[in-house]
From Swiss-Prot:
Keyword Transferase: yes
Species name: Saponaria officinalis
Biotechnology: Soapwort saponins possess anticancer properties and are also being explored as enhancers for endosomal escape in targeted tumor therapies. They may also serve as precursors for vaccine adjuvants.
Chain segments annotated as coiled-coil in the UniProt record: none
Main EC class the enzyme belongs to: transferase
Pathway, per record: Secondary metabolite biosynthesis; terpenoid biosynthesis
One Pfam family named in its UniProt record: UDPGT
Keyword NAD listed: no
Residues of the active site: H17, D114
Identification of the protein by name: UDP-glucosyl transferase 73CC6
Matching InterPro entries: UDP_glucos_trans
Residues that, per the record, bind UDP: S282, W346, A347, H364, N368, S369, E372, Y386
Family, per entry: Belongs to the UDP-glycosyltransferase family.
Length: 487
């Protein structure tokens, strides 16, 4: 039996990146390999409960003072403006020499780092160990990004931001508009240069690891491997492996503001596929007028629902009175009739989605939420906002055909979400399309994918085989290196 590997995991300090990569780290630790997650002091509190005999944390103080940040602000979930985001990014860059020193003085057998740490590719090369790139996205989205590069990119051939174009060269016909592309794709800027730097660092790396399963987008895994010249390991959905018990589902990295019993007792009273779940991830705070439109659409749709709303808890000093974002008597009426539940803060999303009464999900199309929706087998209403979320929308609606669009027309920076209102009529129509008779076929396809997701993570499933194959590859590389040193 080969000796265990020594692996370092370096997650980006944002929930959408930290949660899936820490879950990936746990998969390796559960196989008996020695895993160290490198993170900052405040972020360690989110991960401490996952430490075991084979999973430890290495803590590095973030130089917040040098970056002009308040003590304890160490995660992008706490950032609401571009100036603070820039300071946090700068503070993170100051950690590079400290992390390099730690890794160099205690070399691992492999470095698994988020794409936002391109310098780890050169560090791994110096240490003669493989670097695995972690993308907090799916390979379909990565293929879409590749299609938007170069002088022949399809968005360069249209005459307006709202003219529909086909993304050529993909396994499926995919259509979108220029307005739905990230700003750094539409008009190259400094971030475009960063994207190219991250891409070059990826090409130097051993391969790519994603929280997905091969059967979801197999043609895109092969397509991307051919473009980039290295292998893709789909080893998810990690939540399906790690959070099979309801205790795990309700307490992931962040603490939910409602208890398991409160959620389950309400959901248990509902018919199968009758509840619509609304949540826009860990960072989205819509303006009041957009929240009002969502509430009005939920009310007029007739659907039973759970709605998770950030920034509207009673302790939030920026929160206006409920009359600013809810129709008069809305919450009281929903409670009295049992039609709806509003969760003001972090919701136990996996627990909710996995309940048989939930049949639909309105999502911002962040990859973690998307793969959780797929795993649960629910139809989706897509409401992309920024990052690669419009690409994920096209996967859901055009390739997998398990959802409908809410009607969001423009990509925005995360600080500008809700600038262009999506009206209640569009929202209501999308909810009815997923939850009504028209959504039966969508939900059927979603259930089929859910079955495939669960099979993928079982012993002998594609994700389990990929995990074991990657471990074998890394052990072979380590053993070959040791043999050369010995000779």
């Amino acid at each position: 039996m080969k000796s265990p590997l020594k692996l370092y995991f370096l997650p980006y300090i944002s929930p959408g990146h930290m949660i899936p990569l820490s879950e990936m780290a746990r998969l390796f630790a559960n196989q008996g390999h020695h895993v160290t997650i490198i993170t900052t002091t405040s972020n360690a509190t989110l991960l401490q409960k996952y430490t075991t005999a084979t999973l430890s944390l290495h803590l590095i103080p973030l130089p917040t003072k040098e970056a002009g940040l308040p003590d304890g602000l160490e995660n992008f979930i706490s950032v609401n403006d571009l100036e603070t985001a820039g300071k946090l990014y700068y503070a993170l860059s100051l950690l590079q020499p400290v992390i390099e020193e730690f890794i160099t003085s205690n070399p691992p057998d492999c470095i698994v780092s988020d794409m936002f740490y391109p310098w780890t590719a050169d560090l791994a090369s110096q240490l003669q160990v493989p670097r695995m790139v972690f993308h907090a996205a799916c390979i379909f989205a990565m293929c879409m990004k590749e299609s938007m590069r170069g002088p022949d990119a399809p968005h360069l051939k249209v005459s307006s931001d709202y003219e529909l174009f086909e993304v050529k060269g993909l396994p499926d016909p995919v259509f979108m508009t220029r307005a739905q592309l990230p700003d750094y794709v539409r008009t190259p800027n400094g971030y475009t240069q960063l994207m190219e730097m991250w891409r070059e660092a990826e090409k130097k790396s051993y391969g790519v690891m994603v929280n997905n399963f091969y059967e979801l987008d197999p043609a895109y895994t092969e397509h991307y491997s051919k473009i980039m010249g290295h292998k893709v390991w789909n080893i998810g959905p990690a939540a399906q492996i790690l959070h099979r018990g309801s205790g795990d589902k309700i307490e992931r990295v962040h603490k939910a503001v409602v208890g398991e019993n409160q959620c389950l007792s309400w959901l248990d009273t509902k018919e199968p596929n009758s509840v619509f779940y609304v949540c826009f991830g860990s960072a989205i705070r819509f303006p009041d007028d957009q929240l009002y439109e969502i509430a009005s659409a939920l009310e007029s749709s007739g659907a039973q629902f759970i709605w998770a709303v950030l920034g509207k808890d009673s302790d939030n000093s920026d929160s206006n009175s409920d009359s600013e974002w809810l129709p008069a008597g809305f919450e009281e009426k929903m409670k009295e009739t049992g039609r709806g539940m509003i969760i003001r803060g972090w919701a136990p999303q996996v627990l909710i989605l996995d309940h048989p009464s939930v049949g639909g999900f309105m999502t911002h199309c962040g990859w973690n939420s998307t793969i959780e929706g797929v795993s649960a087998g629910v139809g989706m209403v897509t409401w992309p906002l920024y990052a690669e979320q419009f690409y994920n929308e096209k996967l859901i609606t055009q390739v997998l055909k398990i959802g409908v669009e809410a009607g969001v027309e423009e990509w925005n920076l995360w600080v500008d979400v809700g600038r262009k209102l999506v009206k209640r009529e569009k929202i209501e129509a999308a909810i009815r399309a997923v939850m009504g008779e028209a959504g039966v076929e969508m939900r059927r396809k979603a259930k089929e994918l859910s079955v495939k997701a669960k099979k993928a993570v079982q012993d002998g499933g594609s994700s389990h085989r990929n995990l074991m194959a990657l471990i074998e590859d890394l052990q072979r590389i380590r053993d070959d290196k040791m043999s050369k040193v010995a000779n």
